[in-house]
Amino acid sequence: MFTGIVIGKGEVAEKKLKSAGVVFVIDAKHWARKVKLGASVCVSGVCLTVTRKKGRKLFFDVMPETLKKTTLGGKNSGTRVNLELTLKAGDEIGGHFVYGHVDGVGEVIRVVEQGDNKLVTIRPAPELSRFIAPQGSVAVDGVSLTVASFDRESFTVSLIPYTLEQTTLGELKVGEKVNIEADMLAKLSVK
């Protein structure tokens, strides 16, 4: 389990095709030393298992189903990704509970600069709309955010300078796809 408070950005160093899926090699920078073999890491919102380590590089096996349901299939060498380590007992929960089980993909339809901040509007997959609520929580590429506004087809989040700097969300452009995980409480309340 995660909190949606990204520790930093990594970079896809290599993407190796295999018979069933892909091996992602991520340069996790200095964060790699904190990660153990077999650990779960949230990579741009997707919970993945570290299958190998080599210096600053972490290796992850990604199954075809994950590639199909997330944006990971479109990530190539040089692409930056958000990284978060698992929540441990006693850690501060600064965001909200994020599981790394992506509910679907959304598309960035508007980016507006507002002083040092940005307002980003995202159109989620239609089946996700019922789980998004104004002032509710949502994870976008693994980042815990508050929904600033919502209509039937899209929602907007406000990004402060710290989030823009520390995560890949500062690099978002119109037309880009993002991983979305709706808040578990919202999903349970609809059920």
Which functions belong to the PLM regions below?
Residues 1-191:
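Conserved loop->alpha-helix
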